[in-house]
Curated annotation (Swiss-Prot):
Gene: thiI
TM annotation in the entry: none
Name of the featured protein: tRNA sulfurtransferase
Protein's GO biological process: thiamine biosynthetic process; thiamine diphosphate biosynthetic process; thiazole biosynthetic process; tRNA 4-thiouridine biosynthesis
Superkingdom of the organism of origin: Bacteria
Length: 484
């Protein structure tokens, strides 16, 4: 069994040297991701495709490989195929017939062939021959070239016949690390998650800068979003997560800055700080989730004033998107449930925000800040490899707080998102299971019976550890992590 990875069309249009570089990078990225699934994964680059071989003794890996390939930037689509050899067109038909005989009963069908290499036949001739044979020697209703019930997809490469069993749509975009790095300002809401994803998809290693305005719970939530985006779409490369304690800035804004200018000043301080951090990391651009007119600080006038605080390029991929489109995209990429539970702090600090800030007035207000304020918060910022988010949780959740077996008096809480829980329901005989999504756990845990011990469960164990850590920090001692 193999997967044939088709390159995104924009890659195919590049010059030969660029196309070669992009294809090599995509091959490396695929190998880096799939090696984490299975060390025996084999990836082979060709001029216009990449072949991924599933180990013959591990056919069960096909689903995991397919799921990972669907989330790697630079891929148009992936076809899962079974491989055969052939000597003639009739030989092709004879191998297709037993595979599709039962499937075609009572169905309309057509045959589609893609061919590369030198042969004494063309693709249309194969389609006609195989289609005619299937129509005659199966119980199919007949051939229908438009909107058939079943399409028999075949790919012929020299002496190899690939029978397509499944097609998986890819992300598109460019392979990771074919573009320069960016630093994304992430708050955990709908916008910043989607804007970060857009640049991952575009092939830029996306590092994360978080301005902490809401304490430990806010940071834990944002780390969950960043880790999800990296683990799902950018796992082939290392990135950094920078947490900046921004409460001192907010405190000075509330004490010293004119009420109408607060929102714009806060954003300018964030951009200044992020630009300093980006410069230290050798990064040339910032990414934000701002969308034109969505809030008062995002008018054209205010965005122009915000941009004047730094010479660094500020990229806004969502600038013309409607809010509902952003929410729909967050649902598609898996960040919607995180965003629903994330508090919004930036919009509440100004009661009458200006929509037409004047640069001179804003700069005059900013002179009221302490001289070394940005230096102080940068010095207190914490930079970690994003992989350490999971590792830190492993270290801070002790062995006594992680269990693999369950006592009858313990209760398991499935904290997965509703869609994930429905697709793979957790069932443990004789054990009570409560279903509380992670984004509701912080508010609902206090209502549970304090005499019982609760074991948090999620698929990968990262989110359950983050949530357990937060609850423990809040003083709860009756919570552990369940890792079967």
């Amino acid at each position: 069994m193999k997967f044939i990875v088709k390159l995104y069309p924009e890659i195919m249009m590049k010059s030969k040297p660029v196309r070669m570089r992009f294809t090599k990078m995509l091959e490396t990225n695929i190998r880096n991701v799939l090696k984490k699934v299975d060390e025996d994964a084999k990836v082979q680059r060709q001029w216009d495709r990449i072949m991924v071989m599933v180990p013959k003794d591990k056919p069960e890996l096909a689903q995991a490989f397919g799921e990972r390939l669907a989330c790697i930037p630079g891929i148009a689509h992936v076809v899962q195929v079974d491989e055969y050899s052939f000597e003639s067109v009739d030989d092709i038909y004879q191998q297709v017939l037993p595979v599709y005989r039962d499937q075609l009963a009572g169905k309309t069908f057509c045959v589609r062939v893609k061919r590369t290499g030198d042969h004494d036949f063309n693709s249309i001739e194969v389609e006609r021959y195989v289609g005619g044979g299937l129509n005659q020697f199966t119980d199919a209703l007949g051939v229908r070239l438009k909107n058939p019930d079943i399409t028999v997809n075949l790919e012929i490469e020299r002496d190899n016949l690939y029978m397509v069993t499944k097609r998986i749509e890819g992300l598109g975009g460019f392979p990771m690390a074919t573009q320069e790095d960016v630093l994304s300002l992430i708050s955990g809401g709908f916008d910043s998650g989607v804007s970060s994803y857009q640049f991952i998809k575009k092939g830029a290693r996306t590092h994360y800068c978080f301005f902490n305005l809401g304490g430990a719970q806010h940071e834990i939530g944002v780390k969950q979003v960043a880790y999800h985006l990296w683990k799902t779409y950018g796992e082939s490369h290392k990135v950094k997560f920078i947490s900046v304690p921004f409460e001192p800035v907010v405190a000075e804004i509330l004490e010293r800055i004119d009420n109408g200018q607060m929102g714009v000043v806060l954003k300018r301080m964030m951009m200044r700080t992020a630009a300093r951090i980006a410069d230290r990391m050798g990064i040339q651009a910032l990414v934000t989730g701002e969308s034109l007119g969505q809030v008062s600080s995002q008018t054209l006038t205010n965005l122009n004033v915000i941009d004047r605080c730094t010479e660094l390029l500020i990229l806004r991929p969502l600038i013309a998107m409607d809010k509902q489109d952003i929410i729909n995209e967050s649902r598609k990429i898996g960040t919607e449930d995180f965003a629903k539970s994330m508090p919004e702090y930036c919009g509440v600090i100004s009661q009458k925000p200006t929509v037409k800030a004047v640069l001179a007035k804003v700069e005059a207000e900013e002179k009221k800040f302490s001289e070394d304020l940005i230096d102080q918060i940068i010095a207190q910022s914490v930079t970690i490899d994003i992989r350490e988010i999971a590792e830190q949780m492993d270290t801070r959740i002790t062995e006594t707080e992680t269990v693999a077996s369950i006592d009858t008096n313990q209760v398991v809480i499935d904290i997965r998102a509703p869609e994930e829980e429905e697709s793979k329901p957790l069932q443990i005989e004789g054990i009570e299971i409560k279903r509380i999504p992670f984004f509701k756990l912080a508010t609902q845990f206090a209502d549970l019976d304090k005499q019982k011990t609760y074991l948090l469960y999620c698929e990968r164990g990262v989110m359950s550890k983050l949530q357990a850590l937060y609850l423990i920090e809040q003083g709860y001692t009756n919570v552990k992590v369940y890792r079967p």
